[in-house]
């Protein structure tokens, strides 16, 4: 009995030491976590303050300026060129008391016809609401398809000589995998309620009546596009059937065809046309706060999960 006491005491001391060490490690981890959380919180507050200050300075002062709104990239929901972002920016630009003219800076290959139509309609509405503020479009590299749909909502369109302009048409594309499926011995099993619900299914043979319907669908949208272009350009548009064929042209050729009004850049239009050299960017991009919140949210979630897993593992031991 006496010989076993020292061993029992040593085991107890070892367990106590191990438990204390585990608690110390756990406390250290949580301490680091809360320090990082505090740092992130303070950084977030600082970012909000900086972002608020920069927003407050937009359009500040009593000097007249040219308001610029960018339509850059694919016009689609959730993008910087989405209807929500562009329309919001246009509203702010027209609302600013120091705005002398608004320039939509286009650099887009197109996108959703629904989004483009919404932006176009808002441009026309704001122009009618603020008749004293002219609205221009300036093309950088490319203004095609839905991008041009948006541009024709402006009073005048200015391009660079080498800009790519046009593509007034509608596109629907996809792939067919039936040949590959036959080689692999894969059978397609498609069950629908509604005989046309599986129209243009890439894993089923092409049905001619589906193609006819799809062409009619695109033709309807194409006619809407043509109507918008004719409404926006009016008599400036030359009588040339190829204009609506989906072709693209250089900026210089687009002026000859009446698709654009002249050669110019953002700076030259602000200086010579609007006659307000100061350019204020009203583009509604993802803010610093939104970007930080999105990234921090993902990082914080990852840290919490990792911490929970570690603590759970310590508890099992």
Regions found by a protein language model. Give the residues of each.
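Extracytoplasmic ligand-binding site segments that recognize negatively charged/polar headgroups
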Residues: 167
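N-terminal organellar transit peptides
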Residues: 1-137, 141-160, 171-317
């Amino acid at each position: 009995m006496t010989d076993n006491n020292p061993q029992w005491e040593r085991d107890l001391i070892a367990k106590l030491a191990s438990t204390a060490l585990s608690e110390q490690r756990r406390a250290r981890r949580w301490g680091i976590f809360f320090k990082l959380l505090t740092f992130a919180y303070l950084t977030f507050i600082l970012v909000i303050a900086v972002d608020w200050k920069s927003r407050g300075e937009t359009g500040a002062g009593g000097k007249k300026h040219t308001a610029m709104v960018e339509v850059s990239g694919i016009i689609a929901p959730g993008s910087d060129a989405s209807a929500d972002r562009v329309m919001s920016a246009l509203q702010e630009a027209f609302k600013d008391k120091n705005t002398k003219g608004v320039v939509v800076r286009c650099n887009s290959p197109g996108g959703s016809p629904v989004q483009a139509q919404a932006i176009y309609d808002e441009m026309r509405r704001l122009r009618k609401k603020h008749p004293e503020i002219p609205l221009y479009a300036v093309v950088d590299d490319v203004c095609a398809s839905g991008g041009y749909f948006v541009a024709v909502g402006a009073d005048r369109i200015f391009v660079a000589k080498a800009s790519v302009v046009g593509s007034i048409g509608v596109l629907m594309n996809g792939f067919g995998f039936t040949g590959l499926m036959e080689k692999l011995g894969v059978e397609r099993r498609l069950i629908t309620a509604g005989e046309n619900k599986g129209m243009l299914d890439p894993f089923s043979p092409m049905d001619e009546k589906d193609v006819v319907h799809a062409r009619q669908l695109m033709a309807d949208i194409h006619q809407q596009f043509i109507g918008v272009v004719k409404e926006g350009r009016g008599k400036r548009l030359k009588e040339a059937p190829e204009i609506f064929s989906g072709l693209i042209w250089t900026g210089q050729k687009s002026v000859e065809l009446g698709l654009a009004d002249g050669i110019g850049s953002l700076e030259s239009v602000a200086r010579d046309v609007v006659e307000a050299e100061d350019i204020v960017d009203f583009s509604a991009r993802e803010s610093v706060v939104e970007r930080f919140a999105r990234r921090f949210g993902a990082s914080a979630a990852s840290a919490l999960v990792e911490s929970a897993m570690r603590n759970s593992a310590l508890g099992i031991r």
